[in-house]
UniProtKB/Swiss-Prot annotation:
It is found in: Nucleus. Component of the SRB8-11 complex which consists of SRB8, SSN2/SRB9, SSN3/SRB10 and SSN8/SRB11. The SRB8-11 complex associates with the Mediator complex. The SSN3/SRB10 and SSN8/SRB11 kinase-cyclin pair also associate with the RNA polymerase II holoenzyme. This is Mediator of RNA polymerase II transcription subunit 12. Present with 1730 molecules/cell in log phase SD medium. One of its GO terms (molecular function) is transcription coactivator activity. It comes from the Eukaryota. Keywords: Activator, Nucleus, Repressor, Transcription, Transcription regulation. Belongs to the Mediator complex subunit 12 family. InterPro entries: Mediator_Med12 (IPR019035). Component of the SRB8-11 complex. The SRB8-11 complex is a regulatory module of the Mediator complex which is itself involved in regulation of basal and activated RNA polymerase II-dependent transcription. The SRB8-11 complex may be involved in the transcriptional repression of a subset of genes regulated by Mediator. It may inhibit the association of the Mediator complex with RNA polymerase II to form the holoenzyme complex. The SRB8-11 complex phosphorylates the C-terminal domain (CTD) of the largest subunit of RNA polymerase II RPB1 at serines 2 and 5. One of its GO terms (biological process) is negative regulation of transcription by RNA polymerase II.
């Protein structure tokens, strides 16, 4: 309309009217999208907008623009968007039409579609055809009419990636070749049988999949072949990139078998050991991740999830295990690159590669953790121990907002794996309920056994004790502490183990091991236990030991010297502090109590601790406080007196007056001050060479007189790094020291790599030319073997050290072989040893050299001057040359020498210490009886000879012949019993047994010998047991090597042995029952009581009828439990039983007593300690039975029915009462799990026989429904129910006698409706009901049981496949369905639209799918909900 100003005022439409269904024609539809009907409204629009025109301020500088451009943007300006939308339309069209699917061989889509023909071409023309195919400039219509012969599977795929054929053309070629091959196979088979086409298709699909897999493997492994050629490497990168795209397209088009490919990919990565291929393999895995893990993005919406849920996919479980294993391998590996040109010192590059790989692995593991069922994280026990810390590390480092849910999942997984292990201790549950850091120490004495005393703790880890008793040099303690953090109870147990008298002789490293483990615990990431808490616990232990110090409790007095040494080591490392101890001592008020003897123990302890000058006043103040009770402490041991004594000892050392320092009564604090001064003195000033005499002299001062190994090893590092050793003899002496104290070598030497490299350098480069004769006859092979055996990890880290060790090892072998095969070399070495320049070929005489030098060595053992020392060494080298030349001949002469017996026992000990004779050779000639006489003998001049090698060789011989030696001692004791004999074989037997018998490797032999001693004289068995226990708590002052226990050793307490097997005490054997000895059982002598238990049980079983034996055995077991106050060691006393029938009988006895107690005390709570001991006994015996027989103990019928009654009673209780019986429920479920197979078989058998077993299952289900106060118990019950369901389904499919049923087994619905393992089933909050459940409430619970089992159904909305909706962005709602109608050409739609116009139809669905109106309305496909 003209408004008078020459302009038209046009009112544009408020909005574009959406398309509406044809059922509502009355609604306004915008023009240009529907034929006009010439209504009044349309005529008005025509008059206003078209006939009269439209005018508006132009948007550009010309006025010829159409009005349409203002309303709808032109296609030119929206070309990019239009092309994107059109591309999406074409993609959807290609997904449904115009394609050749691999899973359908009958529908070749499209009118007139026809496969190209195969023709025979020459190689040149075939190559030309392939080049044209790879060129995008050549029309596919031109070359696609035929395909050359000879292109099959591998050739097709190889040509595709070698010539980089465009992907669309490559897919066309592969599809054509695939279907041509299918048609050929179909014609050959000519089978009309049902399923024949499918069989052909599956076989063909497998062949093509194998071809893809073969080429992919080849391309991956070709990567390492192109490292040195950058051009080939670039080509390879293009090829692998292209092939992965081709593989992905063929995978999406189902031209390969997905299942076969998935399994291959997982297995391929799992078996891959080379880290260089891992990144690419993980990249390929991530490409196909969704399909492998069954993540379906197009899954239909499920309103409810019932039992039809997918079971955990096998590949997901396997890939989870594979990824965690790879994470473990990569994280523990030091080097990630195998390239020879790679320098291992490039730590930065190595760490970057390692972190990137770990990041990829952790991201994939997190995806599984967040998206998959938790069943995939259920692992075997061995794997779970490795994966558990890794899984915690990955989850804790995850950057996610759902930390609480992640922790719940992790907790659930951990509980489930722990429940499957069946070894979670109920005692730990009880300990966690109380203060886990509180420990109780009791020194037990008994009037019936006045000589005996033992140390008992409220919590003992017996496996930890076994580990400490074994303690191999190569054991990885850092990893152990990282995986098993030391609790306060373990720390106290560790300290008591290290200072216990029975562990002093064979565990010289115990004190240093304590310091090492405490430092590892303090520096660990676990902050549950702080350093100050550890120090408080140590001083608390010291106060408790001081409180129990008395003449009756001898074990404490014998522990004090070792306690002094341990505390000083801890002070050196800063773990504990003396000022803290003084403050605690003063604040305790013990110093001011007149009747307390504790103060004297504390003062004696303080005198032996390292005191710095800054603490002088505090130290003297403590001594003054006890002057009114004992003046000598202050007069003799005040700080000034300590300094004065220290200076006196220094002067004696400087004057070389060290023959007899007599420092056994000197306080350890003085020794430490002297040691620190002496170490500083040796390492300062002018450096001088060190020979064997000086080395052994300093060893005696530090390790024997001053009792400080730590300072001596510091000095060893100093002389090695400064290359101060003067000759091969001194280096050999150092080797003997390191081998003798090899466990200290691993702890005191800071850098094993540098030390060993320097040691090898001194041996090969410095002393080899300097001391040629000794080099040729001295073997260092034991040290090389020791290092390679005990430090394999070091050799992996440092390849140079490994090469050097291998080289020196081969040199040793070649040196020996040269002397054996080359007589001239022997004569040359012999001349150098004897300083003779003339040829001695005619004077070399093996017997003469042997006799002369052996005689000289035996008659000149006392080295007086330097000349004698040189002659002595020359004689030894001559004999060593004989050994290196012909060992077999040398042993013959030595055998003749031994048979003549023209020597004393000390002469033999001298030869053994000089490495000229071994215990093995002596045993072969003179017998083991003679060897036993030699064992107590040691060198008199131990400080200046080869006594250290004698000690080392003696220990090795005893351990390797442990059983033979003890049996021989036993037989000799019987032989000479009652006769006068200068050697006490019984005492030797006890010394060896106590010293080495607690080692786990020798425990079986120890049990055998103890039982032999007890069986030999049943009447005196009590005396024998007392002797063994006495030796283990109050040993003699020296061991078989005359090594003293240390300063502070009481003088008046020595070993008293019952040589005549009689007891001088007032009691007789009949007065003491064997059970009463168990009151003296502790963690240190547990191995003795294990043997004693075997003896007692054997005696019970042999002397009674079966019925009476069971009753006596029951009384024996529960008397032990009673007399030990339910000690946690009771469950371990049966560990050495060998008879499986006896183990099964004991298990049934203990189970019956427990079940009977539960039924009799239904209204009362059973003692928790009793439950714990009973279950630990059953657990220990069941696991032992399973290890030995690979089966499980079958539950007796009586115990089975008792178990049914107990579960029924528990199911009737309300949740409040159940929570009070948590320990009892746990015990019942553990018994159920131990006999799970036999119980399930009984249940299935009863169900098949129509016996009333369903109530039993209902009771378990009801109990599960009521328990919500403890996640661990709920998981335990769920595990039982799911296992029962699986067992029932499995047994119904197996036709075996064990599963044979007479009829069909019908399981209760509650069991059948058991859903898969879900987090929501166990993490939901459940309100605790008060009061008893009524009948109606119980009925409701039974009805809703299936819902409560599989709770937490999370409804996830998915978009329906092939369903699209048109969404109105302004109204925010869906207006209609977007129809998909396959078509071949866009002209088809024009034809259909013309037909609709002709018929007068108002259907606009055809245009609804056109690309034109999509672009006009800015429409697009989106796989998401716009809400």
């Amino acid at each position: 309309m003209n408004n008078g100003s020459g302009r038209y005022l046009l009112t544009p439409p408020d909005d574009l009217h959406p398309y509406v269904p044809s059922s509502k024609p009355q609604e306004q539809v915008y023009p240009d999208f529907k034929p006009w009907e010439h209504t009044a409204a349309e005529d008005q629009i025509l008059a206003n907008f078209v006939a009269k025109g439209f005018y508006h301020t132009p948007m550009v500088n010309f006025e010829s623009i159409s009005a349409r451009s203002s309303v709808h943007e032109s296609l030119v300006t929206q070309s990019n968007i239009l092309s994107q939308q059109f591309d999406k339309i074409i993609k959807i069209r290609e997904d449904h039409i115009n394609k050749i699917p691999s899973n359908s061989t009958t529908t070749l889509h499209g009118p007139g579609f026809q496969l190209p023909n195969r023709i025979t071409l020459t190689d040149h023309r075939k190559e030309t055809w392939l080049h044209e195919l790879s060129s995008s400039h050549t029309s596919l219509v031109k070359i696609g009419k035929f395909i050359p012969h000879g292109l099959k599977r591998r050739q097709v795929i190889e040509q595709c990636y070698l010539k980089f054929i465009p992907l669309k053309r490559a897919i066309w070629l592969i599809k054509c070749c695939y279907f041509i091959e299918w048609k050929s196979n179909h014609k050959k088979k000519r089978s009309n049988a049902a399923g024949a086409d499918d069989a052909i298709s599956m076989h063909l699909l497998k062949d093509w999949t194998d071809t893809f897999v073969y080429i992919l493997e080849k391309l991956i492994f070709d990567m390492t072949n192109h490292y040195n050629d950058s051009q080939q490497l670039r080509t390879w990168k293009r090829q692998i990139s292209y092939f992965l795209k081709l593989l992905g397209n063929c995978y999406s088009l189902r031209l390969i078998n997905k299942e076969i490919f998935h399994h291959w990919l997982v297995e391929f990565i799992n078996k891959m050991e080379n880290f260089e291929f891992l990144p690419l393999s993980l990249h390929i895995l991530m490409i196909f991740w969704n399909d492998i893990c069954q993540i379906d993005t197009n899954a239909p919406v499920a309103a409810t999830i019932t039992s039809s849920q997918k079971e955990p996919f096998f590949l997901v479980t396997k890939i989870t295990d594979m990824l965690l294993h790879k994470y473990y391998i990569v994280s523990s590996s030091k080097s990630m690159i195998n390239d020879e040109n790679y320098i291992i010192n490039d730590i930065k590059k190595n760490n970057k590669i390692k972190l990137n790989i770990l990041k990829i692995l952790s991201s994939l593991i997190l995806k599984i953790f967040q998206e998959q069922s938790l069943e995939v994280f259920i692992f075997p026990t061995s794997n779970w121990e490795i994966y558990k810390p890794l899984l915690f590390e990955i989850v804790s480092n995850a950057d996610t907002n759902q930390n609480s849910d992640m922790k719940k999942k992790l907790e659930l997984i951990s509980y489930r794996n722990e429940s499957l292990k069946n070894n979670s201790s109920i005692r730990n549950v009880i300990m966690s309920a109380s203060n886990a850091n509180d420990f109780q120490l009791t020194i037990v004495t008994c009037k019936q056994f006045p000589k005996l005393s033992c140390i008992q703790l409220n919590c003992i880890d017996t496996q930890f004790t076994k580990l400490l008793d074994d303690n191999p040099t190569e054991f990885d303690w850092p990893t152990y502490v990282d995986q098993n953090p030391l609790t306060m109870h373990k720390i106290i147990q560790l300290i008591l183990w290290s200072i216990h008298p029975s562990r002093q002789f064979d565990h010289y490293e115990s004190n240093q091991l304590v310091a090492k483990l405490l430092l590892l615990r303090i520096n660990s990431t676990d902050e549950d236990l702080h350093e100050f808490q550890i120090e408080d616990a140590i001083w608390s232990l010291v106060f408790q030991l001081a409180k129990n110090f008395s003449a009756q409790k001898r074990v404490v007095s014998y522990m004090m010297p070792s306690l002094y040494r341990l505390l000083n080591i801890l002070i050196t490392y800063g773990i504990i502090k003396v000022p803290t101890y003084i403050r605690k001592l003063i604040s305790s008020g013990l110093l001011y109590l007149q009747d307390s003897n504790d103060k004297f123990v504390h003062v004696q302890l303080l005198i032996n601790l390292k005191i710095s000058p800054l603490m002088k006043s505090q130290y003297n103040m403590v001594l003054r406080n006890v002057m009114e009770y004992d003046v000598k402490f202050y007069e003799i041991f005040n700080f000034d007196q300590l300094v004065e004594i220290t200076e006196q000892i220094k002067m004696r050392i400087l004057s070389n007056d060290i023959t007899n320092l007599q420092l056994s009564k000197t306080p350890l604090s003085i020794k430490i001050m002297v040691a620190e001064w002496y170490l500083s003195h040796l390492c300062s000033g002018i450096l001088s060479s060190v020979n064997r005499t000086v080395l052994l002299k300093i060893f005696k001062i530090f390790c024997i007189d001053l009792e400080v190994f730590h300072h001596f090893f510091k000095w060893i590092e100093f002389i090695v790094y400064h290359q101060l050793l003067s000759d091969i003899e001194s280096l050999e002496a150092l080797m003997d020291i390191l081998l003798c104290y090899q466990k200290l070598f691993s702890q005191f030497i800071n850098d094993h790599i540098l030390f060993t490299k320097t040691f090898i350098f001194i041996y090969k480069k410095v002393l080899k030319e300097k001391d040629v004769p000794a080099y040729n006859v001295t073997s260092f092979m034991p040290f090389w073997k020791f290092f390679m055996k005990n430090f394999p990890f070091v050799l992996k880290v440092d390849n140079d050290l490994r090469i050097e060790l291998q080289s020196v090892y081969n040199d040793e072998k070649l040196k020996t072989e040269k002397l054996k095969n080359d007589k001239s070399e022997v004569l040359k070495v012999y001349s150098m040893i004897n300083n003779s320049n003339q040829a001695v070929g005619q004077t070399w005489n093996f017997p003469e050299v042997f006799q002369v030098n052996i005689r000289f060595l035996l008659h000149n053992s006392e080295i007086i001057d330097t000349n004698t020392s040189k002659q002595f060494q020359k004689a030894r080298n001559n004999v060593m040359l004989l050994i290196a030349t012909n060992l077999k001949e040398y042993n013959k002469f030595m055998s003749i020498f031994l048979k003549r017996k023209d020597f004393t026992n000390k002469n033999l000990i001298q030869l053994i210490s000089l490495k000229l004779l071994t215990f093995e050779v002596t045993q072969n000639v003179l017998g083991l009886e003679y060897i036993i006489r030699l064992l107590p003998i040691n060198l008199e001049n131990n400080d200046g000879s080869y006594g250290l090698f004698l000690k080392y060789h003696k220990e090795q011989f005893i351990k390797s012949n442990f059983e033979k030696i003890l049996l021989t001692c036993y037989e000799l004791e019987k032989k000479y019993h009652g006769n006068e004999c200068e050697i006490n074989y019984y005492e030797i037997l006890l010394k060896i047994l106590i010293t080495y018998g607690s080692s786990p490797k020798l425990l079986a032999t120890s049990t055998k010998i103890i039982m032999l001693l007890l069986n030999d004289s049943v009447e005196n068995s009590s005396n024998i047991l007392e002797d063994i226990l006495y030796y283990s708590t109050c040993p003699s002052e020296t061991d078989l090597n005359d090594i003293p226990l240390g300063s502070g050793q009481p003088d008046n307490d020595t070993v008293v042995t019952n040589d005549d097997k009689s007891d001088d005490d007032d009691h007789t054997v009949d007065e003491i029952d064997h059970v009463e000895y168990y009151v003296m059982m502790d963690f240190a002598n547990l191995w003795v009581f294990q043997a004693f238990t075997c003896f007692c049980i054997k005696k019970i079983m042999e002397n009674n009828e079966p019925a009476m034996a069971m009753e006596d055995l029951k009384n024996f077991i529960f008397q032990i439990i009673e007399i030990t106050n339910s000690n946690d060691l009771c469950s371990q006393i049966f560990d050495q039983l060998k008879d499986m029938q006896t183990i099964e009988m004991i298990t049934q006895i203990v189970e019956k007593d427990f079940c009977t107690s539960c039924l009799q005390n239904n209204n009362q709570k059973i003692d928790d300690n009793y439950i714990v001991v009973v279950i630990e006994i059953i657990t220990s015996l069941s696991m032992r039975f399973q290890r030995e027989t690979s089966g499980m103990i079958v539950i007796s019928m009586e115990n089975y029915h008792l178990l049914i009654k107990i579960i029924r009673q528990l199911s009737e209780l309300n949740e409040g009462n159940l929570s009070k019986r948590e320990i009892q429920i746990d015990a019942v479920l553990k018994i159920f799990s131990f006999h799970q197979d036999s119980i399930f078989q009984r249940i299935i058998a009863d169900l098949s026989a129509d016996k009333p077993t369903s109530p039993f299952i209902d009771s378990i289900c009801k109990l599960f429904d009521k328990i919500s106060f403890n996640l661990r118990l709920k998981l335990f019950l769920y595990e039982i129910l799911s296992s029962l369901k699986s067992f029932a389904i499995y047994s119904s499919t197996i036709d075996a006698p064990a599963f044979h049923t007479s009829g069909k087994v019908e399981l209760p619905k509650k069991l059948l409706n058991l859903p898969p393992f879900q987090v929501s089933s166990f993490v939901k909050e459940t309100k605790l009901h008060s009061g008893d459940y009524g009948e109606e409430e119980d009925a409701d619970q039974e009805e809703s049981f299936s819902l409560n089992l599989g709770i937490g159904i999370v409804e996830i909305a998915h978009e329906n496949e092939q369903k699209w909706l048109i969404y109105d962005k302004k109204d925010h709602k869906y207006v209609c369905t977007f129809s998909m109608e396959p078509y071949h050409f866009i002209s088809n739609y024009n034809t259909k639209y013309t037909d609709d116009m002709a018929t007068g139809s108002n259907d606009t669905t055809a245009f609804n799918d056109s690309c034109v109106n999509l672009s006009l309305f800015d429409a697009r496909f989106e796989r998401k909900n716009p809400h």
